Amino acid sequence: MDTKGSTVTISSSTPPQNCSGNTNFRTNSSSNKSCCHDGQSTGCALQTPQGQGCGSSPCLYRCPHYLIRTYSFHPCLDDGSRCTEGINTHEKETMQILNERLANYLEKVRMLEGENADLEDKIQEACSKALPILCPDYLSYYTTIEELQQKILCTKAENSRLVSQIDNTKLAADDLRANYEAELSLRQLVEADANGLKQILDALTLSKADLEARVQSLTEELLCLKTNHEEEVNSLQCQLGDRINIEVTAAPSVDLNQILQEMRCRYESIMETNRKDVEEWFNTQMEELNQQVVSSSQQQQCCQKDIIELRRTISALEIELQAQHRMRESQECILTETEARYTALLAQIQSLIHNLEAQVADIRSALQRQSQEYEVLLDIKSRLECEIATYRSLLESLDGRLPCNPCATKWEPSCQARAMECFTPVYTSSSLPGIHKPCRASGPPSRILVKICTITKEIKDGKVISSYEHVQPCYITRATKV
C-alpha cells in the first residue's frame, strides 16, 4: 500500500549523538517531482521549529535532510532466503546509486579543479601582463632627460653670457651716444658763440666804416674850407691889389698845416680814445659774455652729466627690468611646462589608479564569486559526505538488525512520524503500532521509498540568480521484529 502526497513524521527510537533532543521538521511532498537532474547534488530546504536544535557541542558534520515521500511495504515469502535476497538486491541498488553519485561528484570536483587551475593560470598571465604597465622601465628616458637637461643648462649659460655681452654693448653704445650728444651740444654752443662774435665783429666793422666815412667827410670838409678860405683871400687880395697898402702890426700868421695837423692829431686822439673805449666796452662785454657762456657751459655740462647719469641709470634699470621680464617669462614657461608635465603625469597616475581599482574590483568580484562557489561546493561536499556516512550507517544498522529467524507481523503504517536532524549521521527506525501475531519463522519485510530532495540556489548581491532541484530516490528494506 503506497501513501502519496502526505505529511509523514518518523519517530526514532535511537537517540542522536551530541544533540539535546529531537528536532522536528515539517515539509510538504508532492508526487510529481522528477527523480534526478543530471546527477547534481544539492541541499534541501526544511523549516525548523523555534526552540529546538542541537546542543552546545555540535558535531563536525551536518547531515542532509531526508524527506520520505512515499512508503510501501511488500510482503515477502515465509522463507528467509527470499528475504535476504531482496535485501541484498536493494542494497546493491542503493550502493550502485551511491557509487554513481560519488562518481558524478568526483567528476564535478575534477572539472572544478581544472577550472580553478585555468582561472589561476589566467590570473597569473594577467598579472604578468600587467607588470610592465605597473612598473615601466624609465632608465633610457632618464638618460635622455639628463642629456637634454645638460644641453638646456649649457644653452641657458650661453644665452646668459650673450645677454650680458649684449647688455655691455648696449651700455657702451649708450656711453658713446651720450659722449656724442655732449660733444654735439658743445659744438652747437661754440658755433652759437662764433655766430655771436661774427655778429659783433660785423657791428664793429660797420661802426668802423661809419667812423672812417665821418673822418673822410670831415677831411673833405676841411679841405673845402681851406680852399674856400684861400679863394676868398685871393679874391680879396685881387680886389684890394695895390690900392690899399695897409700895414698892420699883428701877430704872426698862423700855420694852417700845423693847425690841421693839430686838429688831425686831436681828432685822432679822440678817435683813439673812442676806439679804446669801444674796445674796452667790447672786451668787457666779451668777458661778461664769455663768463656767462662759461658758466652756462659749466651748468650745461653739469646738467648733461646729470642727464647722462640719469640716462645710464634709466638704461641700467630698463636692462634690469627687461632681464627681470625675461626671467619672469622663462619662469612662467618653466612653471607652465612643469604644470603640464605634472598634470599629464597625474592624469597617467589617475588612469593607472582607476585601472588598478577596476582590476582590484574585478579580482574581488571574481574572488567573491569563487568563494561563494567554493562555499557551495564545500557545502555540497559536506552534504555528500554526510549522505555517504548516513547511507553507510543505515546499511550497517540494517545489516545488524536483520534477525536470523524473523517473525511475521501484521502492521499498518501510520501517517505520523518524526524526523531528526543533527550534525552526525541520522539513525531512523520505524516504531509503528500494529497488531502482533504469533511469531513465525520469518517476518514480512517492509520496503520504504526514501526520496532526497536537494535544492541549490546561486545568490549574488543578495539576489537569487539560479535555483536547481535534485531528487534522489532510495529504497530501504527492513524486516519487522516481534
Curated annotation (Swiss-Prot):
The keyword Hydrolase does not apply. GO terms for cellular component: intermediate filament. Residues 239-254 are annotated as: Linker 12. Residues 127-137 are annotated as: Linker 1. Residues 1-91 are annotated as: Head. It comes from the Eukaryota. Residues 138-238 are annotated as: Coil 1B. Residues 92-126 are annotated as: Coil 1A. The record marks A340 as: Stutter. Residues 255-398 are annotated as: Coil 2. Keywords: Coiled coil, Intermediate filament, Keratin. One of its GO terms (molecular function) is structural molecule activity. Residues 1-24 are annotated as: Disordered. Residues 399-482 are annotated as: Tail. InterPro entries: IF_conserved, IF_rod_dom, Keratin_I. Residues 91-402 form the IF rod domain. There are two types of cytoskeletal and microfibrillar keratin, I (acidic) and II (neutral to basic) (40-55 and 56-70 kDa, respectively). May play a role in late hair differentiation. Belongs to the intermediate filament family. This is Keratin, type I cytoskeletal 39. It comes from Mus musculus (Mouse). The gene is Krt39.
